[in-house]
From Swiss-Prot:
CDD domains: AdoMet_MTases. Its main location: cytoplasm. S-adenosyl-L-methionine binds at residues 80, 131-132, 148. Belongs to the methyltransferase superfamily. RNA methyltransferase RsmG family. Its EC number is 2.1.1.-. The lineage of its organism: Bacteria, Bacillati, Mycoplasmatota, Mycoplasmoidales, Mycoplasmoidaceae. SUPFAM superfamilies: S-adenosyl-L-methionine-dependent methyltransferases. The gene is rsmG. Gene3D superfamilies: Vaccinia Virus protein VP39 (3.40.50.150). NCBIfam families: rsmG_gidB. InterPro entries: rRNA_ssu_MeTfrase_G (IPR003682), SAM-dependent_MTases_sf (IPR029063). It comes from Ureaplasma parvum serovar 3 (strain ATCC 27815 / 27 / NCTC 11736). Keywords: Cytoplasm, Methyltransferase, rRNA processing, S-adenosyl-L-methionine, Transferase. This is Ribosomal RNA small subunit methyltransferase G. GO terms for molecular function: rRNA (guanine-N7-)-methyltransferase activity.
């Protein structure tokens, strides 16, 4: 994907984007390429791969969600943010978003600090912790929790749900394996009082994307999330 192609698609998805938005993405791309070897961020560091696999694939799931509007000021936590995907990408488009980036890897947290500073982003918090540890102090705090390629659906829902307020959303982009993963997650979905209210189904980058949108209907029981090693050993 060329720079021109990316900008054309971006404008189609989000008509309010301006030249400053385009320049922020260009700067983001340059920062990834500059620091990739230092922080071991990704194997996809060519221009076309960053435009397509990083930026566009991260944004596409959010283009048709009613509660993501130009001036949204929702509180969102990106769990396992890594190189800022999808949280920082969303922040560039939705400038009033109140963003928290959660990343367990210290080196990648250092990169996220550099990235957000160089992009001049406001209302961004970065936590170098595991999700199950941070939930002890930030339960029921966010409107939205999301992640990308962190874990299977049952696991990511368990470590995410406690962060979200009642009537908030968990947004989980997945591949065509979504249905298989959701079947395995049916017990945790019920236990955590979640309900899938939407399934966004679309093609992007020649891949079939499925995005599950879950509504949190009640407060998450205090015993969740369990320690990560227990989540791995004894899935519900």
């Amino acid at each position: 994907m060329t720079r021109k192609d990316f900008f054309n698609v971006l404008t189609r998805y989000f008509p309010w984007v301006d030249e400053q938005t385009f320049m922020s993405f260009e700067k983001y791309k340059t920062i990834i390429q500059k620091y990739n070897q230092i922080f071991n961020l990704t194997r996809l560091d060519s221009d076309d791969k960053i435009y397509q696999n990083f930026f566009l694939d991260s944004l596409a799931p959010y283009k048709e969600l009613d509660f993501f509007t130009q001036n949204t000021n929702l509180k969102l936590i990106d769990i396992g943010s890594g190189s800022g995907i999808p949280g920082v990408v969303l922040k560039i488009i939705f400038k009033n978003l109140n963003l928290t980036l959660l990343e367990a890897n210290q080196k990648r947290c250092e990169f996220l600090k550099i990235l957000t500073q160089e992009l001049g982003l406001n209302d961004v918090l970065i936590w170098n912790m595991r999700a199950e540890d941070l939930t002890q102090s930030m339960r029921e705090s966010f409107d939205i929790a999301t992640s990308r390629a962190v874990a299977s659906l049952d696991k990511i829902l368990e470590i995410s749900a406690a962060f979200v307020k009642v009537n908030g959303y968990l947004i989980q982009p997945k591949s065509i394996k979504f249905y298989e993963e959701e079947l395995k997650a049916k017990n945790i979905i019920k236990t955590l009082y979640l309900e899938r209210i939407a399934l966004k189904d679309f093609w992007e980058n020649d891949y079939h994307h499925l995005v599950g949108v879950y509504l949190k209907k009640q407060i998450t029981p205090l015993q969740f999330p369990r320690p990560w090693n227990l989540i791995l050993k004894k899935p519900l």
